Amino acid sequence: MEPPLPVGAQPLATVEGMEMKGPLREPCALTLAQRNGQYELIIQLHEKEQHVQDIIPINSHFRCVQEAEETLLIDIASNSGCKIRVQGDWIRERRFEIPDEEHCLKFLSAVLAAQKAQSQLLVPEQKDSSSWYQKLDTKDKPSVFSGLLGFEDNFSSMNLDKKINSQNQPTGIHREPPPPPFSVNKMLPREKEASNKEQPKVTNTMRKLFVPNTQSGQREGLIKHILAKREKEYVNIQTFRFFVGTWNVNGQSPDSGLEPWLNCDPNPPDIYCIGFQELDLSTEAFFYFESVKEQEWSMAVERGLHSKAKYKKVQLVRLVGMMLLIFARKDQCRYIRDIATETVGTGIMGKMGNKGGVAVRFVFHNTTFCIVNSHLAAHVEDFERRNQDYKDICARMSFVVPNQTLPQLNIMKHEVVIWLGDLNYRLCMPDANEVKSLINKKDLQRLLKFDQLNIQRTQKKAFVDFNEGEIKFIPTYKYDSKTDRWDSSGKCRVPAWCDRILWRGTNVNQLNYRSHMELKTSDHKPVSALFHIGVKVVDERRYRKVFEDSVRIMDRMENDFLPSLELSRREFVFENVKFRQLQKEKFQISNNGQVPCHFSFIPKLNDSQYCKPWLRAEPFEGYLEPNETVDISLDVYVSKDSVTILNSGEDKIEDILVLHLDRGKDYFLTISGNYLPSCFGTSLEALCRMKRPIREVPVTKLIDLEEDSFLEKEKSLLQMVPLDEGASERPLQVPKEIWLLVDHLFKYACHQEDLFQTPGMQEELQQIIDCLDTSIPETIPGSNHSVAEALLIFLEALPEPVICYELYQRCLDSAYDPRICRQVISQLPRCHRNVFRYLMAFLRELLKFSEYNSVNANMIATLFTSLLLRPPPNLMARQTPSDRQRAIQFLLGFLLGSEED
């Protein structure tokens, strides 16, 4: 029973969910209420059998936004619901998961309406000549609430009563999608509590200059833009020492002090950037937030820092086995601001975080830094996959700057980028003995000519524009653990410089680049580099002068001129759009007026996003000075989140974008095109009734087919209506697409090493999708790894999982009773039941060859549970580790049990 609301509080809307506190989840209820004319958000928590209420007033400082799709840690057994962030006056940001997406959106709409209503009630305070602060009428601000909801799907344009793509929750990560469109007002990006209090000091007089303009947010942004252009007038370059280290620890715990690595220079560094790979190799590390190894290595690092200075941890970010720590001298911490972290998994389906990258970006004084720690694909022959991993990390990793209304920043939009990690590039020399002989002769330069990273950089296929210091140390991989002996196992790995540190940017001078042979914990040796980096330090006196001058110039221009834009084109056609295939169209906008201007794409009336979920503009907002031009890219990418409604005809490649010019007019851009339907994202019922490839089926029949299939699934009918009018043959037992993929893997991949653990190649995945959409091939193109990933993508994109949502809880309840488990499966609709049994038979067959393919029952059960047995939307946020374990156990019963009759 929920505790009563405060006296006089009138509830307007309520949602239930979980508050996220690091790895913990606590049940809670969020209630929008009105009391004494004031709107409030009431948070009710259940802590240790006690009820706790927090009340946050809804005023001009209140923020409530929904997150777009993110990857904190890869948890493929979980299917998180909507995530929202709440922040108010003097209150830290709080994060919540709401399981019911539809209710969440309605609740956020109610909060938005309350914010607007409350803003109209605000009465400006009596102005005081001694005070610079003046309350602003919120309604005069430039679309403060437009695009407030930062989610990917534009649900306001959908009929929620229809069968929609209910599986489209942020668990699956496509490898190369454009990021979702973020609202201008999106707040902090994941668990960061960065303070901006150490920015260049702004006096009350300077603040006062901002206020007279009614659109103060726009004005402040324009002045910041002008200040950035005149930066050289008020900054000095000051040199700081950066220590950068990387170590693949092979899942080991620290067994000795790290001083030989971290405290090897006479003078202490100002900043430490320390990256680990393979921190935790346990299966649990892939699916849970907690890791004992994280604590062990973090403490070991803190103990090993330079003894001549005191340090404070600035940030830690971890994705499974990759961890990055940033430490700064305590006297420098106050100059670090705008901290953000991001993670990208490039493992199978872009989910498994065994490979990928983690990064921290920050501003140190007035210079922007991005530190990336990555672990790229293994195996000598897979250098192209490593190149792809690098490109994927660059394409998918973007940061939302805390407390800043700025577009997302990618890695390359920073002034200094340091990239470290186990990049896994090997030597193109198959003879290990020859390599060891050259090492003994200290002929490293000859060996480096065969280094794959050097070759790929020369060919401009990876790490273009990055620099690397001269390598004078012997290869850091592979050794027998606890020794300095080269690998003596049966595989006898060829030594290689897998562990590297590269950088890009100006005023960067590398002093040392070395390995540390003293540490023998792992089969890799740690590597470090010491840098002198020139950092822009603000001279506050000169800054104030430039600031005030910029404001005066702005005042004169605003009084005399209005902004104006010129667009190179306004109509865009995207032809033959396909699932997971990115298309781009570019155009230019030019400031042909006399004053700096701010542009942004804004939502249309009654919309929460400026575009549909398959479209985005990059950049979606920015500043232009007179005669300045910027290129805008319009990107169309159909992911699992939008494929079903496009397949069914509920949506089309049609949209209108509104390009808004502050203090100016709006410009309208027309988007049109055609979409080619895909079997990916089509229901199992519909596919079982298609005897031909989906591209050969008329669109009108596809729509009818999906509608009929939905009704049939709801009624659990055993007999299916045939596709062709007048046809009498029964539907297929399983969709031909699943049969083709599974049959290929059964014939050719049972002995494939690391099956379902190594990602496919992007080009091959697209070939497989096209092949299944357009034909019934005798053989599937691409490698076994690509075919395996295609099968997983297919299962993930299903509108309804193989085990239907309504049977999810029964599956958990019967997880440890094989007899009841089989009874539950027997209640599935016919095609779902057939697909489940077919997949289980195939996976049992794979397990017979585990000696060759490195597949084990726990790994397979964990991976496929997230695809076959997904929790329904109303249970997503409530899913506990126990629920996940029961779901895995349910599948294990079929994988390890005897074959069904």
Swiss-Prot record:
Motif segment (Clathrin box 1): 73-77
5-phosphatase, as annotated region: 237-563
One of the GO biological process terms: phosphatidylinositol dephosphorylation
Keyword Protein biosynthesis: no
Location within or outside the cell: Cytoplasmic vesicle, Phagosome membrane; Early endosome membrane; Membrane, Clathrin-coated pit; Cell projection, Cilium, Photoreceptor outer segment
Rho-GAP domain residues: 721-901
Ranges where the PH domain occurs: 1-119
Span of the signal peptide: none
Resulting phenotype, A797P: In OCRL; uncertain significance
Reported effect, D422A: Does not affect interaction with RAB8A
SUPFAM superfamilies linked: DNase I-like, GTPase activation domain, GAP
Domain of life: Eukaryota
Gene3D superfamilies named in the record: 2.30.29.110, Endonuclease/exonuclease/phosphatase, Immunoglobulins, Rho GTPase activation protein
Top EC class, one word: hydrolase
Stretches the record annotates as Disordered: 164-186
Keywords, sorted A to Z: Cataract, Cell projection, Ciliopathy, Cilium, Cilium biogenesis/degradation, Coated pit, Cytoplasmic vesicle, Disease variant, Endosome, Golgi apparatus, Hydrolase, Lipid metabolism, Lysosome, Membrane
InterPro entries found in the cross-reference section: Endo/exonu/phosph_ase_sf, Ig-like_fold, IP5, IPPc, OCRL-1_2_ASH, OCRL1/INPP5B_INPP5c, OCRL1_PH, OCRL_clath-bd
Disease linked to the protein: Lowe oculocerebrorenal syndrome: X-linked multisystem disorder affecting eyes, nervous system, and kidney. It is characterized by hydrophthalmia, cataract, intellectual disability, vitamin D-resistant rickets, aminoaciduria, and reduced ammonia production by the kidney. Ocular abnormalities include cataract, glaucoma, microphthalmos, and decreased visual acuity. Developmental delay, hypotonia, behavior abnormalities, and areflexia are also present. Renal tubular involvement is characterized by impaired reabsorption of bicarbonate, amino acids, and phosphate. Dent disease 2: An X-linked renal disease belonging to the 'Dent disease complex', a group of disorders characterized by proximal renal tubular defect, hypercalciuria, nephrocalcinosis, and renal insufficiency. The spectrum of phenotypic features is remarkably similar in the various disorders, except for differences in the severity of bone deformities and renal impairment.
Subunit structure: Interacts with APPL1, PHETA1 and PHETA2; APPL1-binding and PHETA1-binding are mutually exclusive. Interacts with clathrin heavy chain. Interacts with several Rab GTPases (in their GTP-bound forms), at least RAB1B, RAB5A, RAB6A, RAB8A, RAB31 and RAB35; these interactions may play a dual role in targeting OCRL to the specific membranes and stimulating the phosphatase activity. Interaction with RAB8A modulates OCRL recruitment to cilia. Interacts with INPP5F.
Domain notes: The ASH (ASPM-SPD2-Hydin) and RhoGAP (Rho GTPase activating) domains form a single folding module. The ASH domain has an immunoglobulin-like fold, the Rho-GAP domain lacks the catalytic arginine and is catalytically inactive. The ASH-RhoGAP module regulates the majority of the protein-protein interactions currently described. The ASH domain mediates association with membrane-targeting Rab GTPases. The Rho-GAP domain interacts with the endocytic adapter APPL1, which is then displaced by PHETA1 and PHETA2 as endosomes mature.
Known function: Catalyzes the hydrolysis of the 5-position phosphate of phosphatidylinositol 4,5-bisphosphate (PtdIns(4,5)P2) and phosphatidylinositol-3,4,5-bisphosphate (PtdIns(3,4,5)P3), with the greatest catalytic activity towards PtdIns(4,5)P2. Able also to hydrolyze the 5-phosphate of inositol 1,4,5-trisphosphate and of inositol 1,3,4,5-tetrakisphosphate. Regulates traffic in the endosomal pathway by regulating the specific pool of phosphatidylinositol 4,5-bisphosphate that is associated with endosomes. Involved in primary cilia assembly.
Family: Belongs to the inositol 1,4,5-trisphosphate 5-phosphatase type II family.
Protein name per its UniProtKB record: Inositol polyphosphate 5-phosphatase OCRL
Protein source organism: Homo sapiens
